[in-house]
Amino acid sequence: LASSVSLRATPLRAANRRVASKSAVRSAVVAPRAMASQDELKQMTGYKSVDDHVESGMVVGLGTGSTAYFAVERLGQKLKSGELKDIIAIPTSERTREQAESLGIPLCTLNEKSVLDVAIDGADEVDPNLALVKGGGGALLREKMVEVMAKKFVVIVDDSKLCKGLGPGFPLPVEITPFCHMHTLRTIAALPSVAGSEAVLRMGSSSTNKPDGDEIAVTDNGNYIVDLHFKEPIKDVNKAAEELKNTVGVVDHGLFVDMSYQVIIAGKDGIRVAGTGGEPAWW
């Protein structure tokens, strides 16, 4: 059964890399304040990622999204207070660049610094192997380019993003070239590894897969996004990643596989940390 195609707008390894192995996914728990709101939990997660993983003199990748926002905020605070010095950061979107500049965080690009000490970003889905779906905010290409070059990629999410299998909980974004975009959309929809999904061209703002306009969404790179909606988990994530990447017209996709070093997770019971060195993933 081939994937269906729709034009409707619907809600939609670098050298020296350290990642969490399947046999060594661990967890730890940090209790939150009583009755913390969702934003407060996101803040705690973002702050913890910087407190635990960023040291003076580092090159840091800055993610995009509502949780990554707090990591950028925390980095700015610690630079302003003098607790951190000599930091150079690489943003993964224009939104993040603007936030970082407003906080006085020194920035560069991969052209100046090709290897990062750590990158911090959110995710839309996380499976028990710490594979991710990312790109709901439309920054998947820059996110992957930056984060694949980090020695440590730290993921920050709330527990609603945890899943048994990638796909059903959040559409998988695929960034494509504008040239003959409908041909590319149909080609993606026909791939065996994504059979049964519905391919939807993102409309309105590229920063959300919820329709908010009548024009085709355009990324920071001038490309379009196809969101793949799944009813069942992706059977072979690695195969899907390979087939999508090898499709002519596809720039990149939102499957981040074998990249996560640690996942910091906010939930009603506190902040839990999954990664090498603790208990197996609990979800």
Region spans (language model):
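Glycine-rich beta-strand-to-loop/alpha-helix junction loops that act as flexible
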Residues: V59-T67
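Short coil/turn segments at beta-strand junctions that form active-site/ligand-binding loops
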Residues: S56-M58, K151
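Active-site catalytic microenvironments in core metabolic enzymes, especially phosphate/sugar-handling
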Residues: A36-V54, T67-K113
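N-terminal chloroplast transit peptides
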Residues: L1-V19
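Conserved phosphate- and dinucleotide-binding cores of soluble alpha/beta proteins
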Residues: V30-S37, Q43-M44, R95-W283
